[in-house]
Amino acid sequence: MKDIKNIFRNVEKRLRASRWFEDEWEIYNRGTYLQLAKSNWYNGSQGGVHFETYIEAPQVKKKAFPVCMHAEEDCPSQAKFIDDFLQLEQARIRSWKGYQVIGDGYSICQRELPLNFKNLEERLLEELNRLRQLESSVDKVLQSLVR
């Protein structure tokens, strides 16, 4: 089995080297768990709005792992944020292959991917870049809630 931590390190390096990755973007990488967020998304303690993926023992056993978007307890007006955000982006998310809109608790959307080490790094980058397209709507909804 390939070293998942190494794959996540490479994903982090490649995200940081991307044209779009600027000072306001942040990555929290805990080995086999990674979050991507912007500094204004209330994610300083990993409990705000973020894109997330992880491959830990249960995912290895299941041979599948999630790529998801969360708005956790540090997100201002969490339930309203999720409702307003999904009003803007639900159709787009549903159009993406394999994505489920959840909108319950802190989960906004998720895609479960098969754990195939052959293209794992590329798949992770592809999905995080897809979720990153939601950036402007996250910013817009957060700005409307904290005026």
Regions found by a protein language model. Name each.
Residues 1-112:
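Polyanion-binding interface signature
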Residues 83-147:
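Charge-biased C-terminal accessory regions appended to nucleic-acid-, cytoskeletal NTPase
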